[in-house]
Amino acid sequence: LAKPVEIVGVACGEGARNKGCEAGPDAVRASGLVSRLQMRGLSAAWHETIRPAQAGYDDSLQAVESVCRRLAQRARAIVAHGGLPVVIGGDHSCAIGTWKGVACALRARGPLGLIWIDAHMDAHTPQTTPSGALHGMPLACLLGHGDSGLTALGGGIALQSQYVCLIGVRSFETSEAALLRQLGVRIY
């Protein structure tokens, strides 16, 4: 029996320079994704759309950390109850919350592997990023490098570098490649 597909929207563009991506989850939901999955025989439900609080953040880092904390809790609960979390963002900083939650739920089973299919490495840290955009940092955070508030989510390091590989990378900065090489991450 297939796992139930449990969709979580993350309407957050705080990690990107262009915040328009925050409209993505609402557009995907309005397109009828859930009903189309159900018509194909899948058990599917849209649980919620996580949004940054309207006020109270001094900067985008605080907003992203809050959103990722809530997303990690939701992803962990979905996996713990036998579901398959499908996260629709927003900017790519949502990968931090997604995989922190999944890793936390599966930690007792052993190391988690990740195949990162992306044109970008997303392995910047606050010290190496030319843009300052958090959506360029999720893989580094998942490997324990970056802002301490983000790396500590979900109990610390989510991934061990020997179980991570990147596919499809075509655009990156030398500092990202250096970090991943130092960690032993495979890049194809």
Kindly label every feature range from the protein language model:
Residues 1-188:
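Conserved alpha-helical scaffold segments that buttress catalytic/binding sites
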